[in-house]
Amino acid sequence: MQQPSVDTSATMSRAVRLESFGGPEVLNLREVPAPQAGSGQIRVRVTAAGLNPMDWFMTSDADTATRFGLRLPSGFGTDYAGVVDQVGDGVTEFAAGDRVFGGALSRAVAD
């Protein structure tokens, strides 16, 4: 399998942002600062993201969102797959270029 190319220097990314509660019309594509991997963390360049019923439920129900710790403005989506593009200090299980999948509370729909 061909190893994906990795750009570890990205400072900006695009992300779907939830800025108020409601239906799909409240979602906006925004250019945002790319997070940096801290100690013990990795950063993933998302190549695919899925939306499940809980994602949609939290966009329209402030009480549920609050129970899950969601604060506005927020990212959107919990399921993702992508490529590790940055590795923080102390991380030994992953390396830049590794293909990964997982879940992240309301931050999956981004690049």
Residue ranges and their predicted role:
Residues 17-19, 60, 84:
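Residue-level signal for short segments within beta-strands and strand-turn junctions
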Residues 1-13:
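Basic/polar N-terminal segments that are highly enriched at the extreme N-terminus
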Residues 11, 25-30, 42, 80:
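Short beta-strand or tight-loop elements
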Residues 33-50, 63-107:
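Glycine-rich beta-strand-centered segment in the early N-terminal region that forms part
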